[in-house]
């Protein structure tokens, strides 16, 4: 037989929604927007690293970081 604990009582509401699925696509579009924004962020970082995106007064030489 399982024993009731205070932590179990606190976490029980989180588990009460187990197995329930929202109808339709739900919030999939929100996830798609955030994935798109993250992709753009990574693309900008890659372009700065490759010096394809030139920014004024920003030197990407890693040797300058040791000074």
Curated annotation (Swiss-Prot):
Q: Name one GO biological process term.
A: protein stabilization
Protein's UniProt keywords contain Transmembrane helix: yes
| Keyword annotations | Membrane, Photosynthesis, Photosystem II, Thylakoid, Transmembrane, Transmembrane helix
Q: Which GO terms describe its cellular component?
A: photosystem II; plasma membrane-derived thylakoid membrane
Which InterPro entries would you find in this protein's record? Answer: PSII_PsbH (IPR001056), PSII_PsbH_sf (IPR036863)
The domain of life for this entry's organism is Bacteria
Instruction: Tell me which SUPFAM superfamilies the record gives.
Output: Photosystem II 10 kDa phosphoprotein PsbH
Query: What is the membrane topology listed in the Swiss-Prot or TrEMBL record?
Result: Single-pass membrane protein
Subcellular localization, as worded in the UniProt entry: Cellular thylakoid membrane
Q: Give the transmembrane ranges.
A: 29-49
Relate the protein's function as given in its record.
One of the components of the core complex of photosystem II (PSII), required for its stability and/or assembly. PSII is a light-driven water:plastoquinone oxidoreductase that uses light energy to abstract electrons from H(2)O, generating O(2) and a proton gradient subsequently used for ATP formation. It consists of a core antenna complex that captures photons, and an electron transfer chain that converts photonic excitation into a charge separation.
Q: Which family does it belong to?
A: Belongs to the PsbH family.
Subunit record text: PSII is composed of 1 copy each of membrane proteins PsbA, PsbB, PsbC, PsbD, PsbE, PsbF, PsbH, PsbI, PsbJ, PsbK, PsbL, PsbM, PsbT, PsbX, PsbY, PsbZ, Psb30/Ycf12, peripheral proteins PsbO, CyanoQ (PsbQ), PsbU, PsbV and a large number of cofactors. It forms dimeric complexes.
Q: What is this protein called?
A: Photosystem II reaction center protein H
Q: What is the originating organism of this protein? A: Trichodesmium erythraeum (strain IMS101)
What gene name is given for the protein in this entry?
psbH
